[in-house]
């Protein structure tokens, strides 16, 4: 039976040393599921509420004991004897129990921990890996996603002078996920050597990418191209580039303030800036190219380069189906970043992915800068045919854990394993 017998939560630490919530669900048949909730550094203003204690004498106010108490009290009592196999019904019960639009009463971190742990428990009860169980919910084919490997960190993810938050390599020319992972790793090694050769720091940021100071943002791209070539790969063929601009972080009074470039640009000027980069470099994906409230700027960018580049809404859409629909209806962006803690339940996460695919938008399953050893997002990416995953660089075990889970899934699929590769960008004409 998949009836819930017990729910338990605790406070643990994430990869930045901040408290986060971990939940466990035990079923009547003894099956057990556990999930830990991630946390972001650069966050959209419309994200579901991550409930923090606010007690400055404890973890500088970042404790999550209130959220833990909500799980161990109200949520555990309400869901006892509920059938965890009814994921949609369980998540609806959680949403109704919270009763707020932004999940601010009980906390999205409380709801999400239980939602994900319940799915793990049902998968265990059915003696299925999580990805296989989730694929029965989504009724999707399965595929190994293209990893978007964040090898240079900037912005809110690093203490350097780089304005843009992430510079990524995408090994689209490989024949399997394992080969793609090898390519990314070899480029990461090569980049370290190149940075040392230029006398630059090889310290890493929150997501495991290198975080040196550069003379300009574009120097980061040039350095990555050098590393790709040194590793024996061809940029534009084997490897494409991706950016997370995270422009809401430097958008102020209607201008984009690029400290590293000593420029303050209007939306039109910043669109020109990004379009010039697209013309000069093998960039296939730009995330949060414009600020979350600059819908007019987003439309300009979409009209300018949207046929040639994947334009990903993260802060713009915050994995929220209601907000995402506005983007679809207005033809804004052409892809959505999927972060489970932005919306707060598994069901709503899967709904956002399904909505993207129905509208011919790409979906990218993503980690947060504050992560744990939890690997749930790897299974979600495979089970939904998301075709792309963002889970950081090639160091820090909180990032590598997801890559290792994808290796396990690829091995389990055997001859049925399919790597998305270039097919992930079939609608993009470069």
UniProtKB/Swiss-Prot annotation:
Residues spanning the membrane: none
Catalysed reactions, as listed in the record: (2R)-2-phosphoglycerate = phosphoenolpyruvate + H2O
Keyword Ion transport: no
Active site: 207 (proton donor), 339 (proton acceptor)
Keyword hit for Cytoplasm: yes
Biological process according to GO: glycolytic process
Enzyme class: lyase
Annotated residues for binding of Mg(2+): 244, 287, 314
Entry EC number(s): 4.2.1.11
Cofactor(s) listed in the protein's UniProt record: Mg(2+)
Subcellular compartments: Cytoplasm; Secreted; Cell surface
Chain residues that bind (2R)-2-phosphoglycerate: 165, 339, 368-369, 390
Record's subunit section: Component of the RNA degradosome, a multiprotein complex involved in RNA processing and mRNA degradation.
Record-stated family: Belongs to the enolase family.
Protein name: Enolase
Source species: Xanthomonas oryzae pv. oryzae (strain KACC10331 / KXO85)
Taxonomic placement: Bacteria, Pseudomonadati, Pseudomonadota, Gammaproteobacteria, Lysobacterales
């Amino acid at each position: 039976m998949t009836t819930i017998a017990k729910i338990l939560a605790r406070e643990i630490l994430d990869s930045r040393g901040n408290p986060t919530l971990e939940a466990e669900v035990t079923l009547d048949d003894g099956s057990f599921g556990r999930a830990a909730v991630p946390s972001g550094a650069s966050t959209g203003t419309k994200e579901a509420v991550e409930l923090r204690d606010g007690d400055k004498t404890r973890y500088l106010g970042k404790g999550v004991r209130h959220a833990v108490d909500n799980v161990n009290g109200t949520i555990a009592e309400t869901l006892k004897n509920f059938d965890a196999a009814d994921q949609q019904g369980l998540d609806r019960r959680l949403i109704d129990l919270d009763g707020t639009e932004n999940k601010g009463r009980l906390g999205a971190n409380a709801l999400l921990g239980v939602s994900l742990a319940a799915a793990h428990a049902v998968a265990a009860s059915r003696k299925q890996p999580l990805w296989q169980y989730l694929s029965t919910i989504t009724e999707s084919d399965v595929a190994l996603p293209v990893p978007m490997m964040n090898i240079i960190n900037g912005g809110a993810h690093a203490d350097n002078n780089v304005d843009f938050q992430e510079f990524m390599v995408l090994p689209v020319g490989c024949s399997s996920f394992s080969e793609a992972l090898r390519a990314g790793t070899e480029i990461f090694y090569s980049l370290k050597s190149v940075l040392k050769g230029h006398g630059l720091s090889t310290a890493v940021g929150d997501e495991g990418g290198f975080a040196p100071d550069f003379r300009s943002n574009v120097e980061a791209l040039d350095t990555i191209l050098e590393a790709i070539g040194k590793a024996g790969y061809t940029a534009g063929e084997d490897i494409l580039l991706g950016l997370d601009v995270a422009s809401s972080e430097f958008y102020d009074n209607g201008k984009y303030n690029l400290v590293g470039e000593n420029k303050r640009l209007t939306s039109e000027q910043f669109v020109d800036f990004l379009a010039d980069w697209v013309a000069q470099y093998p960039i296939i994906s730009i995330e949060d190219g414009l600020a979350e409230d600059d819908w007019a700027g987003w439309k300009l960018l979409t009209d300018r380069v949207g046929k040639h580049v994947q334009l990903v809404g993260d802060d713009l859409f915050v994995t929220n189906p209601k907000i995402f629909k506005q983007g679809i209806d207005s033809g804004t962006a052409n892809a959505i970043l999927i972060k489970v803690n932005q919306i707060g339940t598994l069901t709503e996460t899967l709904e956002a992915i399904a909505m993207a695919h129905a509208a011919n938008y790409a979906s990218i399953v993503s980690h947060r800068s504050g992560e744990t050893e939890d690997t749930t997002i790897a299974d979600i990416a495979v089970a939904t045919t998301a075709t792309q995953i963002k889970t950081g660089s090639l160091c820090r075990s909180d990032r590598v854990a997801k890559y290792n889970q994808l290796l396990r899934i690829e091995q389990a699929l055997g001859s049925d394993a399919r790597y998305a590769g270039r097919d992930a960008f079939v609608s993009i004409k470069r």
